[in-house]
Curated annotation (Swiss-Prot):
Induction remarks: Up-regulated by VEGFA.
InterPro entries: RPEL_repeat (IPR004018)
Result of changing residue 479 to I: In DEE70; severely impaired interaction with actin
Biased composition (Basic and acidic residues): 471-494
GO BP, sorted A to Z: actin cytoskeleton organization; actomyosin structure organization; cell motility; cerebral cortex development; dendrite arborization; regulation of neuron migration; stress fiber assembly
Protein name in UniProt: Phosphatase and actin regulator 1
Cellular component terms (Gene Ontology): cytosol; nucleus; synapse
Effect of residue 521 to C: In DEE70; loss of interaction with PP1 complex
The protein's role, per its UniProt record: Binds actin monomers (G actin) and plays a role in multiple processes including the regulation of actin cytoskeleton dynamics, actin stress fibers formation, cell motility and survival, formation of tubules by endothelial cells, and regulation of PPP1CA activity. Involved in the regulation of cortical neuron migration and dendrite arborization.
Extent of Polar residues compositional bias: 335-345
Bias (Acidic residues) ranges: 395-407
A Pfam match: RPEL
Amino acid sequence: MDYPKMDYFLDVESAHRLLDVESAQRFFYSQGAQARRATLLLPPTLMAASSEDDIDRRPIRRVRSKSDTPYLAEARISFNLGAAEEVERLAAMRSDSLVPGTHTPPIRRRSKFANLGRIFKPWKWRKKKSEKFKHTSAALERKISMRQSREELIKRGVLKEIYDKDGELSISNEEDSLENGQSLSSSQLSLPALSEMEPVPMPRDPCSYEVLQPSDIMDGPDPGAPVKLPCLPVKLSPPLPPKKVMICMPVGGPDLSLVSYTAQKSGQQGVAQHHHTVLPSQIQHQLQYGSHGQHLPSTTGSLPMHPSGCRMIDELNKTLAMTMQRLESSEQRVPCSTSYHSSGLHSGDGVTKAGPMGLPEIRQVPTVVIECDDNKENVPHESDYEDSSCLYTREEEEEEEDEDDDSSLYTSSLAMKVCRKDSLAIKLSNRPSKRELEEKNILPRQTDEERLELRQQIGTKLTRRLSQRPTAEELEQRNILKPRNEQEEQEEKREIKRRLTRKLSQRPTVEELRERKILIRFSDYVEVADAQDYDRRADKPWTRLTAADKAAIRKELNEFKSTEMEVHELSRHLTRFHRP
């Protein structure tokens, strides 16, 4: 017997293999008319088995019409599943009716947060972070390995280069940083041929002028040490380290270059001295005259200047000329006795020495490192006075005289206290003079002639304004100023006097006022009686009342209520004390 082939039915072999007769019947009953029509096309063995069984009396639930083809496709798909229970459950879930049958399992509803796992996946975040960290660290390592040298950065223009003659001078930029991240802040001046030489370290103190001595005229044991100029506690150092200006004046000519290195770390000294700003006039004075009074050849006038350093030296000369006279006066006012180091400047011309290993002859020139104090107003006066070298020299002298430690400590602490308390005098001594204010263009610089001209201009302005004021006649014409004679004024005064005397003569006496019950003073309103003085706060008169007193008060109050107080007729029944 040939069975018709229909694409929406399963083949018979798979139906035999997957289902027994009962489950197939159950499924086809649940699928409606189209599924029931499929039972006619089953093989005879299947039909016989189904006729022998009892007929299923369950009500048939019809869900869709005959034209609904997708359900046939769903039936075909569901036959491929493993068990008939799965088929039945799927059919119940596909149906629009949510009421489960007697044999259908309950519908499994999906959770509210079923879709949350698609969007929100926090278990992957840690992995992403660690991967990101690995990527960034790898990129940083790659950048560090690809870092360029100083010469390449100078070629690219990242670092500035001041001049290149025999030696190269280059100022390190902010971008040229150390390996640990700290940026180089000091200016560096280096020779490629003399890279092995030890640089001369300068103290870290930001407020000291230092003169580097010529290497050939040193007689002391410390040939490379800088000579510290004596200090004056007049200009106090700003709290932050200011900008440095290097004055380099090579002696031999343009082919000789200066080797100096400015390091930030100072040597470990016994006493950490903060030097005050050395005055520029003192620098000139100390360059010309040594510590022992011996005359040195003047360096600023005779030395030829390097072409690239001309601008800096011009600026320095301007500042020297600007502050010369004021600083000389302050020098006379506050003398300070300080001593040079053991290695002093000696007289004599600078002689060039041949360097080691056949290097070209190099002459060390006196180099002045000057700090530009841009912020003179924000000055910690007391702390600088505490650390001034004058106090330290006094303490050293006391120690040399072998005085008691306690007494020296007491005197030094007393001196510190006096210096601290004298801050007003320090501030007054640090006030800038008129000339300095004029030089800073804070006060306008004026000669006597300019001052006189300004006064004359102000005078002419005032006279012109006074001449523009209206005269008395104009004011009279405008009816602002009324014309008056002396006789008229006298008459007005007499009239006022007459009126006042008439009023005073017509004033009633106190008795008349009392008769009219017009009282003047407060005592006229109040009856005065003598009373005993007692503590009114502590006194509680109701505690002294007896039961009879209380009853009398109550009776009086009730009578007053019943007779004097008016009560509305509608609320009279609410009162206890109404008239009978």
